[in-house]
Every structure is written in structure tokens, then in C-alpha cells.
Amino acid sequence: MEWLVKKSHYVKKRACHVLVLCDSGGSLKMIAEANSMILLSPGDILSPLQDAQYCINREKHQTLKIVDARCYSCDEWQRLTRKPS
């Protein structure tokens, strides 16, 4: 299943991206943590490869690995993206 990036936040301290992903129909929304050397932007499309790897915008040489995923909640998004005090 392809995923559309709706929101993207890079967590420098953990060196990972936190993403809000939506399926093509817009009915399924997830929060995913991913490892990637490439910055992701809203509107990017993630296409599945294998072993939790995805290519970015159907470019097979631009990949990321999903390390954690969960159902979307506003509280969880705020927790993951807030600045440390």
C-alpha cells in the first residue's frame, strides 16, 4: 500500500523522521517513525519495497525504513514533535 506524507518532522536528538501518513483514500491515518538520509515533505509518496522499506516518490534509490508505526492521534503527534525543555 502506498502512503501519502501529510506531515513531517525531523527529531534531531533521535535522528529520525516522525511522519503522519494517510492511505490513498484518506480513511487510514498513521504516525510512523522512519530512518532516512533524505528529508521528507508533505505530499511525498511512500511506495512499499520489502522489510518495512519504502521508496520515496517512486524513486527506488531514495529509500527509508519504518521503525515504528501506530494509529494517529493528535496527542501522540504533539508528544513526538514537541521541543525538549
UniProtKB/Swiss-Prot annotation:
Classification via InterPro entries: PmrD_dom, PmrD_sf
Superkingdom as given in the UniProt entry: Bacteria
Alphabetical UniProt keywords: Antibiotic resistance
Entries under Pfam families matching the protein: PmrD
Induction description: By PhoP. Repressed by BasR.
Gene Ontology biological process terms from the UniProt entry: response to antibiotic
Function, in words: Interacts with phosphorylated BasR protein to mediate transcriptional induction of BasR-activated genes to induce polymyxin resistance.
Family as reported in the entry's similarity comment: Belongs to the PmrD family.
The protein's name: Signal transduction protein PmrD
Species: Salmonella typhimurium (strain LT2 / SGSC1412 / ATCC 700720)
Gene name linked to the record: pmrD
